[in-house]
Every structure is written in structure tokens, then in C-alpha cells.
A protein has these predicted regions:
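Basic, Gly/Ser/Thr-rich N-terminal segments that form RNA-phosphate-binding interfaces in CRISPR RAMP
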Residues: 1-313
Length: 313
């Protein structure tokens, strides 16, 4: 059972396709979505696999507790991420699905706005509390669940025209909110994205759902026959992407090592130290600041920035 949890943020730099395979809808290759809300997500399995690949390619030496190890040490990776033959034992490091927090939408003023909604904010707050975190700015608790729909951060927004925001071709009347201002400043500190207080707006749950369905990037792709210079038969398809600037969050989860004999626990065999804490320490030491997630890696898609909860910059 997991004993420790560490939140982290995923800031999409280039459009990201975490796909579900082919479907019969309008888009041939849609992105992953939650079944009950329709909100975009990245499955934990895909996130974990991408993270493991980065660890396996990094030969940097790090200190975990009082022992030193290479990040790509096979024994350590198998103990944390799990062995290739899963029947032997489970890994001590897990991940949750990456959930949407802020979604970028074209704005008449300020180029684009970050939109979210009360449902997303309330769920984010609940999950942070479950993980043992606090949402406070300078010692002041932020009432996220009290932030209403159709609001903007008081005094900081740069996407408003009078008291309205124009997103795509839709106009929304907004009201200033002090709690949203505090939350936006707090989130900017945690993610390192300084423009959040100037661009964030809270819409209704239904309006948010419409935008995350209708304002993703859908790209038409083709394959050219080198001999004829024309499109090959059946080689025209559409592919959906989460747009650049999208912000998601996930949790790294740690448990004690799933080995009975101390000598089989590798660097995590440190009497007097919490094994789950050592697993998180290894993750924090080896996690990448920039990595690739999802499909189309060879055409530059899916580049993201990873920001741990504890990081200051």
C-alpha cells in the first residue's frame, strides 16, 4: 500500500497526443478522456512508462539516503518502477492519472486565457489535502472551493475587455474574486509559470467542458507516395492533441519495497529510514525537468516540463 504522495505539475510545451486508438467519431485518433466528465487526461500507465524510459537513459549518480547509485541502475529501477516480469514483485513507485487543471483558449485580449471551473478546482483541492498538502499563500489558507464560476483574479487579469472576456467567439461576463487572485499567485509560485495571475479565468463547469471538447488541436495528416507524389490510399487521417500551455497535475506514490529479504532491497536497505520516503527521494533525484510523453515523438510532439511540488524555481 502506498504510504507517501508527491504532487507534481505537467506543463505542455508542444501539443501532446496521449491517444485511445482509432474510433468511429469525427476524429480518427482522439485523446484520452475521463469517462464521466469528458475532461482530457493522461493515463497513469503512459505517464509511468515515459518516466521509466527517462530514468533508464540517465546515468547520473545521485545520493539516496546515505547511499549513492546511478539513476539507470537496473536493480533500483526494477525495485521502484517494477520488473519487466511483473509476476516477481510489484514496483514501489506509482502514479495517478494526470488530470486537467488549466486549459488554454484563444482570447481577444492577451492572446490566450487559462480557463478552469469550480469542479476542477474543488477536485484539485480535495486531492491535494488527501496527499497531505496545504494550499496556502504566506500562511493564509486559500478557499479554493469557494471560488465561483465566471470570476477573474482581482486586480491582475490582462485578458478582460471591461469586465468581459472574449474566448474564441464567445463572450463571458466575469466578476473579480480575491480568493482566485490568491490561488493564481500560489499556483504561479508552485508551477513557475508567472503569467497565470494575468490569464486565469473561472468559467462554469458546462462551459469548461465545451471548451475542452471543442478547442483541442485537431490536425489532418497524410502520407505521400514517394513514387507518385500523391496521397496514398487510406493514408489520410485526423489526430487530436492537447494544446501547448495546457497544465495538468499528477501524484507520484511511494510504498515500501516489495521484497522480504533486506539484502534484496538494494539501496533502499537502510535501517532506521522510511523506505517509501527513500523511494520518493530517488524519484525526486532522477525525475526529468523536461521529457516527452505520448505519441509522435519524432515530429516534436509531447514535450512537457515537469515541476515538483517542492521545487521553488
Amino acid at each position: 500500500m502506498f504510504k507517501k504522495a508527491l504532487p507534481f505539475f505537467i506543463h505542455i510545451i508542444t501539443p501532446l497526443h496521449a491517444g485511445t486508438g482509432q474510433e468511429l467519431g469525427i476524429v480518427d485518433l482522439p485523446i484520452q478522456r475521463e469517462r464521466h466528465t469528458g475532461f482530457p487526461k493522461i493515463e497513469a500507465s503512459g505517464l509511468k512508462g515515459s518516466m521509466r524510459e527517462v530514468f533508464e537513459e540517465n546515468n547520473k549518480k545521485v545520493k539516496v539516503g546515505n547511499k549513492e547509485v546511478s539513476i539507470n541502475d537496473k536493480i533500483t529501477i526494477d525495485l521502484t518502477f517494477g520488473p519487466e516480469a511483473e509476476i516477481s514483485h510489484a514496483g514501489a513507485l506509482g502514479f495517478t492519472d494526470a488530470r486537467i487543471l488549466l486549459f488554454p483558449v484563444k482570447s481577444m485580449k492577451g492572446v490566450f486565457a487559462y480557463i478552469t471551473c469550480p469542479q476542477v478546482l474543488k477536485r484539485f483541492e480535495e486531492e491535494i489535502i488527501i496527499a497531505g498538502g496545504k494550499i496556502e499563500l504566506n500562511g493564509q489558507k486559500i478557499n479554493i472551493s469557494g471560488i465561483p464560476k465566471n470570476s477573474f483574479p482581482k486586480d491582475t487579469s490582462q485578458v478582460l475587455v471591461s469586465s468581459k472576456v472574449i474566448l474564441e467567439e464567445y463572450t463571458f461576463e466575469l466578476n473579480p474574486n480575491e480568493d482566485l487572485k490568491l490561488f493564481a499567485n500560489w499556483l504561479a509560485q508552485k508551477t513557475g509559470i508567472e503569467k497565470i495571475p494575468q490569464k486565469i479565468v473561472v468559467l462554469s463547469n458546462d462551459d469548461f467542458k465545451d471548451f475542452v471538447h471543442l478547442s483541442t488541436e485537431v490536425i489532418t495528416r497524410i502520407k505521400i507516395n514517394n513514387a507518385t507524389g500523391t496521397v496514398e490510399t487510406g493514408a489520410l487521417f485526423t489526430e487530436e492533441f492537447l494544446p501547448a500551455e495546457t497544465i495538468l497535475y499528477s501524484f507520484a506514490l511511494a510504498s515500501p519495497i516489495f521484497k522480504e529479504k533486506p539484502e534484496e532491497k538494494g539501496i533502499f536497505n537502510q535501517p532506521g529510514k522510511d523506505e517509501a520516503e527513500l523511494v520518493l527521494e530517488f524519484f525526486k533525484a532522477g525525475r526529468p525537468k523536461v521529457m516527452q510523453i505520448g505519441g509522435d515523438a519524432t515530429i516534436g510532439k509531447g514535450i512537457v516540463r515537469i515541476k515538483l511540488w517542492e521545487d521553488e524555481k
